[in-house]
Amino acid sequence: MCGIVGVVGNTNATDILIQGLEKLEYRGYDSAGIFVVGDNKSQLVKSVGRIAEIQAKVGDSVSGTTGIGHTRWATHGKPTEGNAHPHTSGSGRFVLVHNGVIENYLQIKETYLTKHNLKGETDTEIAIHLVEHFVEEDNLSVLEAFKKALHIIEGSYAFALIDSQDADTIYVAKNKSPLLIGLGNGYNMVCSDAMAMIRETSEYMEIHDKELVIVKKDSVEVQDYDGNVIERGSYTAELDLSDIGKGTYPFYMLKEIDEQPTVMRKLISTYANESGDMNVDSDIIKSVQEADRLYILAAGTSYHAGFAAKTMIEKLTDTPVELGVSSEWGYNMPLLSKKPMFILLSQSGETADSRQVLVKANEMGIPSLTITNVPGSTLSREATYTMLIHAGPEIAVASTKAYTAQVATLAFLAKAVGEANGKAEAKDFDLVHELSIVAQSIEATLSEKDVISEKVEQLLISTRNAFYIGRGNDYYVTMEAALKLKEISYIQTEGFAAGELKHGTISLIEDNTPVIALISADSTIAAHTRGNIQEVVSRGANALIIVEEGLEREGDDIIVNKVHPFLSAISMVIPTQLIAYYASLQRGLDVDKPRNLAKAVTVE
């Protein structure tokens, strides 16, 4: 949610800011702005809408070597130009961008800022006026005023501050919100995501919570809020420009759907050796073995991936698995087992709700494993252990390859632990072979894009509602399938356990209601699901049947190549991803950037 980019150095800041903000578009936003200063001149440009509108406003009129930019996803205040970032202080001297939520902004306003002319509706405006207040009223330097403000401000935040009277410095601070420093030659940068700086640098420095950084073109100094200097090394990010381009694809989502066979094979080469033996950290295996119950905490698509792997983990390890929604557990953690272990699933590794749970787990001394796509992310740094899903950058807001990669990564973990436990079922489960078959199954489904597109046009082009139904693992897939369809096509969609239809949901079925049924696993489950299909068809529904090879009947719509039952949630989800894609495309919507959504949810 939101994105920050900043640069100080000897280069054209405007171009870098615009390019950086474009790389952060995938995070989600409704307004944007930049501030550039240099040669005793400065300019602030803001707009509601896309980055292109900022670019059009800028033209050739803005130049300078220091600047900050921001994409905003509204939390406090409507998406207006006035509420867009950057924000200025009352005198215009100080300029600030902010991600996060200032929880005590009303208290700050009433205590310190009663004489200040606050124009907007945002909590960010409070922060910049507070800094100016301490400079003017307490006669503090900018650095000391910023520190004093940081001691008072409560909540989650990532700040980048410029004093227009000192165009050679950006002041940065963070707490519970992602922010990085990019190190260049003769310039340095600030960003929410390494993606924003991929053209300029591959060397980065982490900022930890409640740290302040003084960024100049030739130096970076990290301090705590009391002014103590902290030594901090840098690291090199493994990103490539080719990874973040669309190439010949019209949308990132379609590209990322197509990349899933490659991701499966990448995971095989990462978590298994040439002999097919598991290559999972022995410390992780031991920690899982010592747990009497595993708790998978996640949100959105990652939550569904946890469900998709639950049965497999339990059968291969003999360890019970419980799923939890991170946003609920952060406030209301249930009674835990005697030896719990937390597994946190997050594509970005920055999900604020999951981090809230992780902080509590660490306080309680509970071991934790983060499964993420981003090395060095907050959840990765703060968990006891990390496993990477190696999906490559996922730009589209609607997650696809991260879901399948999370399920596959959990499969490697489950097999490794099961083998260590001496479980025969785990030893007999040839994961390398079976996941190779999954990759082939995905490729076969991807070759049927035209067929799926035609089915979507017949079924979903004008509907306002739709339902997915399934049993067993297929039910878990329907949850993810429904989320995909609703978030990018805006069709109100729900995924249900097929057996629950008659307990209430069937009352919503009427003429031409689309019902998409998933059938895999075995003939007994298939027969029951087909019975449910007949129930809705007899009440006027239009049914589309996605069925695994070997269970198909004449008239079924999409046949998915058979895979091992433990991995069917991967192969069965692929046609539903394409259904969502084509439903959005055929409705003329922005597939990659659905309204109101953010890629990384970094506020609670």
Curated annotation (Swiss-Prot):
SIS domain residues: 284-423, 456-594
EC number of this enzyme: 2.6.1.16
InterPro entries associated with the record: GATase_2_dom, GFAT, GFAT_N, GlmS/AgaS_SIS, GlmS/FrlB_SIS, Ntn_hydrolases_N, SIS_dom, SIS_dom_sf
Residues covered by the Glutamine amidotransferase type-2 domain: 2-218
Localization per Swiss-Prot or TrEMBL: Cytoplasm
Pfam families: GATase_6, SIS
Record: active site: 2 (nucleophile), 599 (for fru-6p isomerization activity)
Origin: domain of life: Bacteria
Protein name as catalogued: Glutamine--fructose-6-phosphate aminotransferase [isomerizing]
One biological process term in Gene Ontology: protein N-linked glycosylation
Quaternary structure and partners: Homodimer.
Function field: Catalyzes the first step in hexosamine metabolism, converting fructose-6P into glucosamine-6P using glutamine as a nitrogen source.
Originating organism: Streptococcus agalactiae serotype V (strain ATCC BAA-611 / 2603 V/R)
Keywords, sorted A to Z: Aminotransferase, Cytoplasm, Glutamine amidotransferase, Repeat, Transferase
GO MF annotations, alphabetized: carbohydrate derivative binding; glutamine-fructose-6-phosphate transaminase (isomerizing) activity
Cysteines engaged in disulfide bonds, as pairs: none
Catalytic activity as recorded in UniProt: D-fructose 6-phosphate + L-glutamine = D-glucosamine 6-phosphate + L-glutamate
